[in-house]
């Protein structure tokens, strides 16, 4: 299950190469997104703040189409979460006690019929993705679609039966989003589990058998699940006809909620999805580059947080939006007093955003490639305004050619440059009155402009220094 790697990678898998159970994550390799990169990274045992974050990371992986996928999310004694692939028993190396080696981070089924997990971890949740089921003879297209976008009876039975090993499960439906079910051990749930349990001969009971053949409407099964436990949309769908386009709890009124004619609530219910925990901002930069959207048709932005007392960094998942309109309230919920809520112990370190695609007629006559792979004058002004209000913050930008640029520590020239950027500065660059290099020099002279991850346009990692001419002009103005 979970065929996301080729056999060659299975042989070379580094799952057994890390004996220490540290909960900090190493920096990601600076490579474009691909499953081998994700798997190599997961072999390093990256930790996540919440179970939802780990599930969302798995949801972002590109699994082989039309295959059964099963992973588990583990929790360690420090309360951090980790991703672990399910490995069939015949492919698992175990010690003399029948348990997997304590340096391995995968889950298997032991001979005694229980889940085997690495020492120091417990199972927090299962993660599933299923191939499409065949449509039933009397099943409508709508109900068939619902059935292919919801948990199977067996998925939920595993978390609601009295002998369960974990009480939460996730289902990835690709571009239709990620949903979760959390058991609340209700009387209704216990009664439902009796009707989902296998018969003594191992065969399915009538309800499950009918449902799997399309004989029971999926919408009825969904209502039963909603009444039994806690269902929520963890990652919303990104396709036009996604069943759920809003994160949050799924209620019995879910059909009404997905009606395109209904007015959607704009309030944020849940904490945003966060990246793994990193020990430095370079790890965040690499993660953003690997997990960036495949399409550059729209701009996206997010927030970077740092722990108040430890070198721990996390970033929110990218939110499609214009950077100029982005702020904390876009992704974070508010308390009863209207204050933005952050994870306990964390503060805002800065913001990140991708570039906004430029139309061909809005490019300068020369050095257009550098202009496209740099902060736009409009976005730069937004960042300057933020940094004047909070000088301790940092701004990261992901360029189209996969560089990650950073600006921080604003200096005195920032205020004068803000004024200059409001006076149709972009038109002057496009017309050639101001060259792209002059714009880069002005920004470099106004603070710490750096390349965190290189690209063709920005091949050298480190601080970008302004030219001598720009420095001289600024010094004369200061006098």
Positions of PLM-derived features:
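Active-site-proximal loop/helix of nucleotide/amide-processing enzymes and allied scaffolds
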Residues: 106-252, 256, 331-479
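Glycine-rich short-loop/terminal segments
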Residues: 2-122, 204-345, 437-479
């Amino acid at each position: 299950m979970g065929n996301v790697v080729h056999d060659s990678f299975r042989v070379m898998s580094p799952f057994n190469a890390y004996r220490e159970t540290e909960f900090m994550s190493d920096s990601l390799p600076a490579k474009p997104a691909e499953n081998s990169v994700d798997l190599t990274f997961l072999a390093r045992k990256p930790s996540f703040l919440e179970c939802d974050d780990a599930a969302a990371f798995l949801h972002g992986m590109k699994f082989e189409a039309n295959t059964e996928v099963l992973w588990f999310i583990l929790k360690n004694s420090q309360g951090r979460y980790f991703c672990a692939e399910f490995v069939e028993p015949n492919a698992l190396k175990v010690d003399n006690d029948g348990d997997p080696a304590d340096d391995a981070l995968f889950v298997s089924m032991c001979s005694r019929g229980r889940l085997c997990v690495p020492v120091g971890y417990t199972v927090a949740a299962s993660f599933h993705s299923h191939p499409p089921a065949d449509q039933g003879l009397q099943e409508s297209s709508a109900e068939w679609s619902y059935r292919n976008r919801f948990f199977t009876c067996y998925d939920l039975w595993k978390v609601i039966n009295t002998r369960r090993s974990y009480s939460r499960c996730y289902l990835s439906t690709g571009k239709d989003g990620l949903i979760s079910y959390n058991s609340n051990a209700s009387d209704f749930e216990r009664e439902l589990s009796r009707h989902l349990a296998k018969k003594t001969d191992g065969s399915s009971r009538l309800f499950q058998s009918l449902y799997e053949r399309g004989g029971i409407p999926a919408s009825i099964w969904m209502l039963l699940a909603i009444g039994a436990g806690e269902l929520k949309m963890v990652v919303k769908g990104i396709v036009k006809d996604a069943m759920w386009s809003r994160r949050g709890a799924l209620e019995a009124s879910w059909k009404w909620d997905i009606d395109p004619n209904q007015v959607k609530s704009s309030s944020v219910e849940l904490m945003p999805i966060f990246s793994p925990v990193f020990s430095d901002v370079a790890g965040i930069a690499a993660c953003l580059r690997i997990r960036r959207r495949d399409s550059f048709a729209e701009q996206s932005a997010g927030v970077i947080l740092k722990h108040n007392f430890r070198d721990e960094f996390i970033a929110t998942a990218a939110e499609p939006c214009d950077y100029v309109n982005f702020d904390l309230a876009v992704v974070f919920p508010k308390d009863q007093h209207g204050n933005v809520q952050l994870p306990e112990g964390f503060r805002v370190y800065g913001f990140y955003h991708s570039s906004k695609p430029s139309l061909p007629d809005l490019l300068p006559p020369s050095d257009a490639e550098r202009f496209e792979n740099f902060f736009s004058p409009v976005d730069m002004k937004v960042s300057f305004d933020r940094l004047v209000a909070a000088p301790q913050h940092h701004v990261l930008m992901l360029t189209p050619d996969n560089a990650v640029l950073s600006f921080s520590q604003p200096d005195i020239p920032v205020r004068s440059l803000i004024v200059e950027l409001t006076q149709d500065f972009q038109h002057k660059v496009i017309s050639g009155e101001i060259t792209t290099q002059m714009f880069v020099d002005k920004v470099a002279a106004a603070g710490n402009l750096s390349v965190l991850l290189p690209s063709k346009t920005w091949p050298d990692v480190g601080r970008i220094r302004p030219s001598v001419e720009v420095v001289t002009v600024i010094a004369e103005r200061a006098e």
